[in-house]
Amino acid sequence: MEQSEAGSAADSIITQFNTYEDFLDSQITALDLHYLEDEELARQLVELGYRGSGEVLKRDEFEARKAAAEASRLSQRTQQKTLSSAGKDPKDNFLKALAMREEANRNGKMTSVIFIRDKNAHGQEVSGYIDFAHRLKTEDFEVYFSGKKKLLPRPTDLSFYNWESHVSTSNPSPNYQVIAETSSGLLFKNKRDRKILNVDPKASPGDNSTRTSIQTDIYIQAVIYDHITRRKS
């Protein structure tokens, strides 16, 4: 109990004072300076425990605790910065919708599939289904949330189609298996809970899944399918 209280007192000290000298100075009274006539000597006496009415804390312990506190602060800051949408103020509904889903897709609680139909840099109409969680892990989304770059489907995504060249591809991802050419059209099987995600707009998206059509000014069409992942027991 005493050890815990001492630790709490030390933590309070390193929070309150920026340097060890500041802490020592706080323990020195005007009377000490009057009799000793030497600030450095007064500091040494406080450090040795001969002066001061508060907690005696050695320099190395103060500096070690200070370093640990700074490391903890930087770690928390880094964790906060892992969200690519952090600090961004997207104006378009599509980017706002992605920002709302980013954290859940990063921590595995949700695996969203994004459908995009738009024109590429060559003016060709393309469409495709993107595993949002996978793309978040494999590229920097800050350029999308800041508006510097436009998110578009690629031939390496879950599904891709170029309406002009008629190039069509489909690929599994770490989260989904592609089940193509069924009577129900294109289906995706979640690899974690093995639930089927149906992207047919006329059908139900499936268990633990929702379909959200986004009103957007930057794409011809955008739809987000959210699947709440539940590991199969």
UniProtKB/Swiss-Prot annotation:
Keywords associated with the record: Cytoplasm, Nucleus
InterPro entries for this protein: DUF4464 (IPR027887)
Keyword Nucleus: yes
Coiled-coil regions, chain positions: none
Keyword Glycosyltransferase: no
Cysteines paired by S-S bonds: none
Compartment(s) of residence: Cytoplasm; Nucleus
Pfam families assigned to the protein according to its UniProt record, in alphabetical order: DUF4464
GO cellular component terms, A-Z: cytoplasm; nucleus
Role this protein plays: May be involved in spermatogenesis.
Name of the protein in question: Cilia- and flagella-associated protein 299
Organism: Xenopus laevis (African clawed frog)
